[in-house]
Amino acid sequence: MTIDRTYPIFTVRWLAVHGLAVPTVFFLGAISAMQFIQR
């Protein structure tokens, strides 16, 4: 039953990485777009 114990950890880690990476990329894209529009 080691697979059942490591699976949730991998899922939580995957969700945490994507949950932080997606908004960060979107936020950086919005900032770069704002600065590009201001110029």
Curated annotation (Swiss-Prot):
Heme binds at H18. The chain crosses the membrane at residues 14-30. It is a single-pass membrane protein. One of its GO terms (molecular function) is iron ion binding. It comes from the Eukaryota. With its partner (PsbE) binds heme. PSII binds additional chlorophylls, carotenoids and specific lipids. Keywords: Chloroplast, Electron transport, Heme, Iron, Membrane, Metal-binding, Photosynthesis, Photosystem II, Plastid, Thylakoid, Transmembrane, Transmembrane helix, Transport. Its main location: plastid. One of its GO terms (biological process) is photosynthetic electron transport chain. InterPro entries: PSII_cyt_b559_bsu (IPR006241), PSII_cyt_b559_CS (IPR006216), PSII_cyt_b559_N (IPR013081). Pfam families: Cytochrom_B559. Its cofactor is heme b. It is found in: Plastid, Chloroplast thylakoid membrane. One of its GO terms (cellular component) is photosystem II reaction center. This b-type cytochrome is tightly associated with the reaction center of photosystem II (PSII). PSII is a light-driven water:plastoquinone oxidoreductase that uses light energy to abstract electrons from H(2)O, generating O(2) and a proton gradient subsequently used for ATP formation. It consists of a core antenna complex that captures photons, and an electron transfer chain that converts photonic excitation into a charge separation. Heterodimer of an alpha subunit and a beta subunit. PSII is composed of 1 copy each of membrane proteins PsbA, PsbB, PsbC, PsbD, PsbE, PsbF, PsbH, PsbI, PsbJ, PsbK, PsbL, PsbM, PsbT, PsbX, PsbY, PsbZ, Psb30/Ycf12, at least 3 peripheral proteins of the oxygen-evolving complex and a large number of cofactors. It forms dimeric complexes. Belongs to the PsbE/PsbF family. This is Cytochrome b559 subunit beta. It comes from Physcomitrium patens (Spreading-leaved earth moss). The lineage of its organism: Eukaryota, Viridiplantae, Streptophyta, Embryophyta, Bryophyta. The gene is psbF.
